[in-house]
């Protein structure tokens, strides 16, 4: 799952655009953004250590050739939304930027956004993109200097029928509701690259990437909830309007210096900023009454504003000394330093709109919350505003030193051996849950992480690989703060006493390349996880999910098969650089996970959270190229079993 993977961008750690997750959504990275994507499931000393499943490295696109300019436009229709009366909340503009203005105080009604959603008709999914670049030659040595820029905008609509059902630990159903959810997703992405080569020995590159992603939704839910009046079988209505407005800005400076014919220096820095906003979340609950519905009293009418600011600085410097092996000349010795310094600052303001004057709403088909919640009724004491503040900070500092050697002893044998030392310091300070949870905690760990990777070439087309390594998984910021987040179908709360997990990894892989562009691969893997982290349901009157080290250890084992096959490749007539190609890809895996939890009723253990036993991906791609023009059409099928 998300917890055990790591995503890097040009070799630097990349945070998610959504603070809810560890890894960024790969949906942002189309062919106009990426040069290549590498997936590594065997780990070495120079790579990421906070990983247990796979490291996904995205290499950003650079200019190819002397220059180019391209445009793109696309549209689509969702049959569930195109002709529907689509509910859209107030406060988000065409570009997806939300109005984040909070009231100056709680002594008057001065919220900027309306409570009543509007109705929109004829929703069309759409996207636009533009890209271009130019190459220049500088100085008497004609050193190449290139610029590349791409940007895009996407809007799409979704409609979902939802069932929300919650039970207590004893099995009693306390929530059973059916809902309709209307969601609009708006995003923009921009990538700029400047690349400079000096005398074919030194290289400097700068990348700027900005991602803005807004998801806004209106959900209407009817049914049973224990918070509703028991005079009418706990029946009622809930409307939840939520916006998640997130921004990720990435700045990268990368350099490579050829010091001698055998010695080079790689150095660089990356500064990432994440702004995660949930502005003016609106929750309203109406309980069933004799003549219709009434607004529920207590803390059941809320407006909520939260902000998460994350600053993420990454630095690295490494020396590479190339060794003579008189075979493929791939042997080398590497040693260096990497550092990652992350500051998370979270603040949330909750406004409880306590009901004083109860008025009856005859029908849910036509009602207005703005007719009740306004300045006139506030001045008449129909309701009061109570303000609550929550905040926490998490600081994470990781210093790493590594050394590794790669040597090709014979045309068949290649060995990579490495050692990495990580010093991890994490500190969390919190004052949350209306002052009910105050405190701080620290995680301080020293990791010695050995790795060994062997490759044996059976012949020109077959090879065997063996990987043995130790890695770890750190808790996310939200998982070690006891702030309780209120979701539509569950509440979740962090655990400041959570400990990191240690991973011991073993991978054995067979590769068969019938042709240079085709592949058949079979992998068997085993992992031992100490102190595995999982999300669990806490036995309490409130009923919420939290994070725990659920066992002393867990085991993971499985097999994976991958096939890349060219069905046909034909030249295009009357084209010097033409190709008509049809290819297919298949990737499938089976994963067995087991953790034996103390005091569990099932003594045989249970599978880890988020681990799907069966995963299958299939694609059929047609690529037509003629000169500088190309057309790619791909059919993709995915299957993921129940987790």
Language-model regions, residue ranges each:
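Short acidic/polar hinge/loop motifs at secondary-structure boundaries
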Residues: 12-41, 61, 86-87
């Amino acid at each position: 799952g998300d917890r055990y993977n790591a995503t890097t961008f040009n070799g630097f750690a990349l945070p998610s655009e959504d603070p809810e997750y560890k890894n960024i959504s790969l949906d942002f990275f189309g062919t106009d953004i990426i040069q290549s994507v590498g997936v590594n499931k065997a780990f070495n000393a120079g790579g990421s250590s906070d990983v247990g499943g796979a490291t996904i490295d995205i290499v950003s696109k650079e200019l190819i050739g002397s220059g180019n300019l391209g445009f793109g436009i696309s549209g689509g229709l969702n049959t569930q939304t195109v002709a529907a009366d689509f509910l859209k909340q107030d406060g988000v503009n065409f570009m997806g930027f939300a109005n984040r203005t909070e009231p100056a105080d709680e002594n008057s009604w001065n919220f900027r956004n309306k409570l009543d959603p509007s109705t929109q008709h004829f929703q069309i999914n759409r996207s636009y993109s533009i890209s271009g670049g130019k190459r220049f030659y500088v100085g008497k040595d004609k050193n190449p200097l290139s610029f590349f820029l791409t940007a895009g905008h996407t809007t799409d609509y979704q409609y979902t029928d939802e069932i929300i059902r919650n039970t207590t630990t004893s099995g009693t159903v306390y929530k059973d509701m059916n809902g309709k959810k209307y969601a609009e997703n708006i995003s923009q992405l921009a990538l700029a690259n400047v690349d400079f080569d000096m005398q074919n020995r030194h290289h400097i590159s700068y990348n700027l990437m900005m991602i803005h992603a807004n998801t806004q939704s209106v959900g209407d839910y009817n049914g049973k909830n224990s918070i509703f009046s028991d005079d009418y079988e706990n029946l009622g209505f809930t409307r939840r309007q939520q916006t998640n407005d997130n921004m990720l800005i990435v700045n990268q400076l990368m350099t490579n210096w050829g010091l001698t014919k055998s010695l080079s220096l790689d150095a660089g820095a990356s500064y990432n900023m994440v702004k995660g906003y949930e502005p003016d979340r609106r929750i309203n609950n109406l309980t069933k009454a004799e003549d219709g519905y009434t607004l529920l009293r207590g803390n059941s009418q809320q407006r909520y504003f939260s902000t998460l600011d994350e600053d993420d600085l990454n630095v690295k410097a490494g020396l590479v000394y190339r060794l003579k092996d008189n075979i493929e000349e791939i042997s080398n010795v590497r040693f260096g330093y990497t550092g990652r310094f992350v500051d998370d600052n979270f603040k949330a303001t909750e406004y409880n709109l306590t009901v004083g004057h109860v008025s009856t709403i005859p029908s849910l088909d036509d009602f207005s919350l703005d007719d009740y919640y306004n300045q006139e009724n506030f001045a008449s004491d129909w309701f009061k505003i109570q303000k609550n503040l929550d905040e926490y900070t998490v600081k994470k500092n990781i210093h790493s030193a590594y050394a590794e050697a790669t040597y090709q002893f014979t045309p068949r044998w290649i060995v990579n051996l490495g050692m990495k030392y990580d010093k991890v310091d994490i500190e969390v300070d919190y004052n949350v849950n209306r002052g009910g949870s105050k405190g701080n905690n620290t995680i301080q760990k020293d990791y010695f992480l050995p790795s060994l990777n062997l490759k044996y070439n059976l012949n020109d087309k077959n090879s065997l690989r063996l990987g043995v390594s130790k890695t770890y998984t750190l808790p996310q910021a939200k998982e070690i703060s006891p702030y309780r987040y209120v979701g539509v179908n569950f509440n979740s709360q962090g655990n400041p006493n959570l400990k990191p997990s240690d991973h011991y990894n073993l991978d054995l892989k067979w590769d068969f390349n019938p042709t240079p562009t085709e592949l058949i691969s079979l992998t068997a893997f085993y992992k031992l996880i100490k102190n595995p982290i999982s999300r669990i349901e806490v036995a309490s009157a409130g009923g919420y999910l939290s994070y725990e080290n659920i066992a002393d250890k867990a085991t993971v084992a499985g097999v994976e098969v991958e096939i890349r096959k060219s069905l046909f490749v034909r030249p295009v007539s009357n084209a010097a650089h033409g190709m008509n190609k049809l290819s297919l890809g298949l990737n499938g895996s089976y994963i067995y996970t087991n953790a034996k939890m103390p005091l569990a009723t099932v003594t045989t253990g249970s599978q880890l959270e988020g681990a799907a036993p069966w995963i299958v991906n299939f694609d059929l791609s047609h690529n037509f190229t003629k000169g500088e023009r190309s057309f790619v059409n791909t059919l993709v099928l995915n299957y993921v079993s129940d987790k």
